[in-house]
Amino acid sequence: MPKQKAPRKQLKSYKLKHINKSIQEGDAVLMRSSEPGKPSYVARVEAIETDARGSHAKVRVRWYYRPEESIGGRRQFHGAKEVFLSDHFDFQSADTIEGKCKVHSFSSYTKLDSVGNDDFFCRFEYNSTTGAFDPDRVTVFCKCEMPYNPDDLMVQCEECSEWFHPSCIGTTIEEAKKPDNFYCEECSPQQQNLHNSNSTSNNRDAKVNGKRSLEVTKSKNKHTKRPG
């Protein structure tokens, strides 16, 4: 009669001796890439288990994908530290964990005073099979009608509260950083003098309340499935 395998123990936390840190369910971690020279994978710990003696720890992880691993690849509005929470789960040896990291919400990330090497942000969930995103649309800004990339400086119009990239309004980053009040072309005093107050008000309401958005999912031209 074949020997039955001993049941594995489910743990809420586990001490990783090789990095001298403890992990628990819900932690974001950096995991060793299977491809030399590639950056560490980012994952969320969903479960931890060991054998009956408390050895050979494994973690069930939910992978975060980088934009370049998705259908459509990296796009202009994707931040350098942006990741997508995928529907791809795996069991991995706990020994492949290289450290802990922090995956912030998009709102929290934009409020950070400084961004460390272990800081990331997530604003989309990603279906690794279909390439669909949730949400599938995102608000756009500026003349270029692009979603906000937290790596790129933007300036806000004092009148209509719209945001603009310096390059899109014909100025430099240095000029945009000056404390002077900024007015976009439509809200500038010169432009307002060409319209009566009623038409100016209508234009402003249309700009602020238009809720312009961009569809995130792109036509299929690239798809990288995380190995494992």
Swiss-Prot record:
The stretches annotated as zinc fingers (PHD-type) lie at 139-190
In the UniProt record, what gene is named as encoding this protein? SHL
In what ranges is there compositional bias, type Polar residues? 191-203
Motif Nuclear localization signal: which ranges? Answer: 210-217
Chain intervals for the UniProt region annotation (Disordered) = 191-228
The record places domain BAH at 21-137
Where does this protein come from, organism-wise?
Arabidopsis thaliana
On subunit structure and binding partners, the annotation says: Recognizes di- and trimethylated histone H3 at lysine 4. Interacts with HDA6. Interacts with DEK3.
Q: Does the keyword Transcription regulation apply?
A: yes
Biological processes per GO annotation: flower development; negative regulation of gene expression, epigenetic; post-embryonic development; regulation of photoperiodism, flowering; vegetative to reproductive phase transition of meristem
Q: Where is the composition biased (Basic and acidic residues)?
A: 204-218
Does this UniProt record's set of keywords contain Transcription regulation? yes
SMART domains the UniProt entry points to? BAH, PHD
Matching PROSITE patterns: BAH, ZF_PHD_1, ZF_PHD_2
Which PANTHER family does the UniProt entry name for this protein?
OS08G0421900 PROTEIN (PTHR46364)
Protein name per Swiss-Prot or TrEMBL: Chromatin remodeling protein SHL
Family as reported in the entry's similarity comment: Belongs to the SHL1/EBS protein family.
**Feature: compositional bias, Basic residues:** 219-228
